């Protein structure tokens, strides 16, 4: 038999019954009822209802004390922030509702001088901004809050904020700032207690930066594996899945896709295999293993959110796609001295414009010795020996011209 749904009226009635003389058991019962109603609203995806709840029980916050009230508010807010709003207009509306809920709670905490609560809610807002890809606002708020936390020496919250600042900086293409923020987080984990969640977050971001800037995929894989274990140990399936996704990415970049079957068969990983994120990255890995550009492009198109909009993957998938395209072009062109652009595109399975751009880039990068005939829409490939001797012949021509000029000059001197 299902439990009777809790109503706002029942919660308000219970809150009104509490006084300074209420026993611990009575206060705890009221607190449990509030959280039960909050979870119920989260299941119903009612963020507006959760905001109403937060505002309607504020008399209870004064009754239970600052520390307990802060935890209660943060728990209720977290219920709202974990609501999946779907896609399209509903998603955009949900983002706004979540931001409004947090800013409303931050405003209340500020006006009531609940500074610890205000800072922790601001840290959560930074994470929300990153989650909804509003990296500019995330970075701005993170910079301001970091300065305050450094003065207060609130190391645990500083670690959280620094990791989020590093994430926003990375997504805004500021790797120097991303590294600096991550270094701050790492320094503070050495001198303060970091929860398993925080330590896993630091490991995850370390893996991201090592893969993006250093191209050190072995070290990145180790960091992502540590992050996976950390998130999995506390039941954080969302972040654990992301860490596993990036582990697979590292195997692709290391050209070790043949090891994926063994990795994914591991006891602690099997439960994550059916996640859309893992299915997406595996489709990319399969295409790369088969060296099929067509399948690779198809994977990117079918899993755009996971493989293109995720910058951690996109940084590498774009390079992989470019390299695979150039190899395909070289393979098709190799037997010919002149070949139509339309034929190359047809064999590769792409349209002409991206193929033409890729060939132009290859010529500029000296990966292909040839030229594009714009009138005939063909690619003229120079013979390899001829291409190798072009520079030598050019120097010889210049030397001959120099001799001619010198002779002409010396002859004119005799006429004077």
From Swiss-Prot:
GO terms for cellular component: proteasome regulatory particle, lid subcomplex. One of its GO terms (biological process) is ubiquitin-dependent protein catabolic process. Residues 217-386 form the PCI domain. Component of the lid subcomplex of the 26S proteasome, a multiprotein complex involved in the ATP-dependent degradation of ubiquitinated proteins. In the complex, rpn-6.2 is required for proteasome assembly. GO terms for molecular function: structural molecule activity. Belongs to the proteasome subunit S9 family. It holds the Pfam family RPN6_N. It comes from the Eukaryota. SMART domains: PAM, PINT. This is Probable 26S proteasome regulatory subunit rpn-6.2. Keywords: Proteasome. The keyword Lyase does not apply. The lineage of its organism: Eukaryota, Metazoa, Ecdysozoa, Nematoda, Chromadorea. It comes from Caenorhabditis elegans.
């Amino acid at each position: 038999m299902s439990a009777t749904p809790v109503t706002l009226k029942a919660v308000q009635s219970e809150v009104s019954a509490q006084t300074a003389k209420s026993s611990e058991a009575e206060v705890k019962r009221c607190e449990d009822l509030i959280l039960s109603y909050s979870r119920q609203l989260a299941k119903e995806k009612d963020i507006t209802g959760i905001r109403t709840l937060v505002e309607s029980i504020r008399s209870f916050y004064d009754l239970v004390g600052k520390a307990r009230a802060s935890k209660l508010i943060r728990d209720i807010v977290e219920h709202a922030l974990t609501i999946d709003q779907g896609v399209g207009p509903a998603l955009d509306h949900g983002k706004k509702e979540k931001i409004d809920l947090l800013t409303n709670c931050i405003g209340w905490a500020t006006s009531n001088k609940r500074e610890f609560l205000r800072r922790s809610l601001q840290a959560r807002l930074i994470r929300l901004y990153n989650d909804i890809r509003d990296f500019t606002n995330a970075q701005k708020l993170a910079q301001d809050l970091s300065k305050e936390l450094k003065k207060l020496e609130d190391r645990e919250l500083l670690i959280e904020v620094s990791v989020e600042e590093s994430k926003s900086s990375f997504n805004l293409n500021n790797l120097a700032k991303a590294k600096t923020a991550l270094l701050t987080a790492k320094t503070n984990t050495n001198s303060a207690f970091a929860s398993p969640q925080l330590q896993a977050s630091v490991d995850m971001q370390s893996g991201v930066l090592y893969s993006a800037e250093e191209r050190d995929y072995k070290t990145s894989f180790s960091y992502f594996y540590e992050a996976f274990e950390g998130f999995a140990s506390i039941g954080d399936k969302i972040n654990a899945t992301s860490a596993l996704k990036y582990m697979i990415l590292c195997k692709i970049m290391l050209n070790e896709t043949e090891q994926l079957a063994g990795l994914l068969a591991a006891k602690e990983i099997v439960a994550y295999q059916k996640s859309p994120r893992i299915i997406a990255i595996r489709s990319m890995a399969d295409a790369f293993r088969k060296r099929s550009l067509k399948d690779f492009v198809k994977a990117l198109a079918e899993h755009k959110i996971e493989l293109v909009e995720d910058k951690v993957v996109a940084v590498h998938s774009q390079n992989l796609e470019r390299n695979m395209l150039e190899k395909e072009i070289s393979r098709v062109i190799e037997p010919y001295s002149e070949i139509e652009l339309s034929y190359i595109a047809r064999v590769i399975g792409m349209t002409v414009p991206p193929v033409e751009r890729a060939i132009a880039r290859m010529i500029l990068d000296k990966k292909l010795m040839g030229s594009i005939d714009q009138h005939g829409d063909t690619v003229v490939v120079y013979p390899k020996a001829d291409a190798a001797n072009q520079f030598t012949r050019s120097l010889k021509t210049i030397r001959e011209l120099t001799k001619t000029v010198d002779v002409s000059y010396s002859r004119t001197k005799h006429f004077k």
